[in-house]
């Protein structure tokens, strides 16, 4: 365990190993189990433990700190980006910009953007995740608009917080379990037909709540029941568009390339649907990039803590995007949005990053 602790953080979590291992060994599962054992035997560093237990597991504290950070970032902010940081932080923004925390998160905008539908076909509860709530709220608005356009009522449970992935990924399953219980309760109370997440990592985490809470049978059963309702945005919308006869290829126009999120493709198995949605968007022509399913190098904490390793991975992704000649790089993961938007701003400013929800929302009302 002592040797494992030295190397475990260098796993970027891309799950590429599951595709190349000839023995089909569940390497990600082994790493996750070893992380849990390491925490049980050796504990977490004090600062990390305090952050997980007192910030991530406490919605009000976590969200209050994010709101304060949106004020504190002002000296370094340029529009919606942070392009330069001082002193020892400078390396974080050398080859990529960082997204600024929004002045007004999605949860504060929701009541004004969600339409009241007379006879909705379904009731959806939207799990935004931290990044879409506080960094990319406009994309969260797009998700709501697309669902409303499908005659789906959307509600936003106020008590939702982080999905718990950053905590669980570092082996602190006790705190992750506390977070899971909070989210299960929040979404049970929403009484929705379906729960929509526009982040594949959050979707995967919700699906794993039953396993996470397996030692607490009552909560595990509740979590499994709830997890069965959780759908990833692109796969769900593609299904609904297909039913409505709206998943038809458009005449083309702007070149759009697509980056496959690691968790989207290799965990959820979703890769055809996002492409069909792009092709269905009026005025969009899909152009595939080389190695579209290779990691962008973000992987949450990894992309910040090991920026020197993350940047070469990002550069390869940027080179592949530029080679397509695309005007837009579409993504379907809020974590990848952080990395790719930042990389494009510094290395390919002529290319814009958009979540697929944004592309679809822009096309609402346009004739096919």
Regions found by a protein language model. Name each.
Residues 1-2, 111:
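N-terminal [4Fe-4S]-dependent radical SAM core
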Residues 2-3, 282:
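Short, charged helix-to-loop "capping" segments that act as catalytic/coupling loops
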Residues 3-25, 263, 293-294:
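Cysteine-centered iron-sulfur cluster-binding motifs in ferredoxin-type domains/subunits
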Residues 27-368:
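Iron-sulfur cluster-binding electron-transfer modules in prokaryotic oxidoreductases
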């Amino acid at each position: 365990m002592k040797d494992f602790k030295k190397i475990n953080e260098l796993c970027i979590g891309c799950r590429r190993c599951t595709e190349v291992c000839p023995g089909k060994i569940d390497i990600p599962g082994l790493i996750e189990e070893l992380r849990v054992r390491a925490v049980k035997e050796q504990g977490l560093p004090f600062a990390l433990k305090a952050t997980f237990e007192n910030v991530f597991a406490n919605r009000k504290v976590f969200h209050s700190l994010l709101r304060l950070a949106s004020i504190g970032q002002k000296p370094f902010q340029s529009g919606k980006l942070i392009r330069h940081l001082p002193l020892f932080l400078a390396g974080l923004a050398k080859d990529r910009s960082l997204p600024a925390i929004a002045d007004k998160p999605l949860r504060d905008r929701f009541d004004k953007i969600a339409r009241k539908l007379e006879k909705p076909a379904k009731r959806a509860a939207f799990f935004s995740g931290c990044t879409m709530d506080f960094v990319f709220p406009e994309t969260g608005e797009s998700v709501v608009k697309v669902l409303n356009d499908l005659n789906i009522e959307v509600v936003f449970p106020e008590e939702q917080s982080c999905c718990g992935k950053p905590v669980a990924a570092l082996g602190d399953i006790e705190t992750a379990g506390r977070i899971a219980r909070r989210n299960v309760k929040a979404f049970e109370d929403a009484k929705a037909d379906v729960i929509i997440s526009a982040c594949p990592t959050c979707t995967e985490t919700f699906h794993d709540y039953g396993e996470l809470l397996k030692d607490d049978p009552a909560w595990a059963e509740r979590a499994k029941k709830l997890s069965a309702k959780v759908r990833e945005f692109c796969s769900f919308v593609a299904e609904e568009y297909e039913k409505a006869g709206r998943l038809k290829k458009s005449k083309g126009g702007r070149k759009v390339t697509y980056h496959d999120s690691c968790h989207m493709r290799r965990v959820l198995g979703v890769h055809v649907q996002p492409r069909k949605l792009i092709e269905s968007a009026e005025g969009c022509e899909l152009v595939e990039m080389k190695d579209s399913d290779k990691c962008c190098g973000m992987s949450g904490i990894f992309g910040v803590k090991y920026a020197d390793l993350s940047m070469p991975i990002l550069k390869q992704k940027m080179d592949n995007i530029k080679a397509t000649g695309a005007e837009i790089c579409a993504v379907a993961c809020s974590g990848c949005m952080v990395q790719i938007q930042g990389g494009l701003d510094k290395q390919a400013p002529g290319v814009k990053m958009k979540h697929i929800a944004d592309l679809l929302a822009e096309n609402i009302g346009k004739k096919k």
